[in-house]
Amino acid sequence: MVGFILTGHGQFAPGLASAIAMVAGDQPAFTVVPFEGDQAASYGEDLRAAITAMREECDGVLVFTDLLGGTPFNQAMMIAQ
């Protein structure tokens, strides 16, 4: 199974996850890591921890972000390398 991590600025990720749950129900191997201003200092560590945990239980991990070139995208790319 492939794991999915949804991340983005502000309430983008939790809001989209809520819509997905309403339409498709709870999904296995799916987690949300929001990037909010008051948690900016720990965001990279939080995302890395989520990816590491997902790798332990899944065959692969896809990280979905809101903006190409934004902090969530850039952090995910740095972790992937």
Regions found by a protein language model. Give the residues of each.
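N-terminal loops that bind phosphate or other acidic moieties
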Residues: 1-81
